[in-house]
Amino acid sequence: MLDIYERLGTHCHDPVYTTVTLTHEQRDRGRLKLVGENNEEVRVFLERGKPLLVGEFLKSECGKIVQVAGAVEDVAHASCEDWEAFSKACYHLGNRHTKIQIGERWLRIKPDHVLEDMLHMLGLIVTHEEAVFVPESGAYSHGHSHH
């Protein structure tokens, strides 16, 4: 069993001992009990409020390196050719504090029929797909205070 208390960031030159594949919701939690790809139990004890990143490296108490991978999960994918419609869609989702992954005139959200209907009414084409969900971290996630 590996106990993890330390984050190493997204760059590490040490060999990876095992990988854990996590959904977006799992990457958002500070305490996890998992099984690595090598079938070894992995317990994570990290600071809450700082989601794990896909590709991030963690270090166990015994010095072994564990890498975080993103799990493929069901997402709603919305797209359009019109930048104005796309901008409005992003605005309305942000106004609802919805976690959103943004590309060039496409976005992904967790499936939600109300939000999907809104996106459709704004002119976006909405489909469901299986993909790794990596939403934007948010404007205030860097932790700096400017008071």
From Swiss-Prot:
Gene Ontology CC annotation, any one: cytoplasm
Cytoplasm as UniProt keyword: yes
Cross-referenced SMART domains: UreE_N
GO biological process, one term: protein-containing complex assembly
Compartment(s): Cytoplasm
Domain of life assignment: Bacteria
Record-level Gene Ontology MF annotations: nickel cation binding; unfolded protein binding
Keyword Chaperone (UniProt): yes
Record Pfam families: UreE_C, UreE_N
Keywords: Chaperone, Cytoplasm, Nickel, Nickel insertion
InterPro entries: UreE (IPR012406), UreE_C_dom (IPR007864), UreE_N (IPR004029), UreE_N_sf (IPR036118)
UniProt cross-references to NCBIfam families, sorted A to Z: PRK14113.1
Recorded family membership: Belongs to the UreE family.
Summary of the function given for this chain in its UniProt record: Involved in urease metallocenter assembly. Binds nickel. Probably functions as a nickel donor during metallocenter assembly.
Name of the protein this chain belongs to: Urease accessory protein UreE
Organism from which the protein derives: Marinomonas sp. (strain MWYL1)
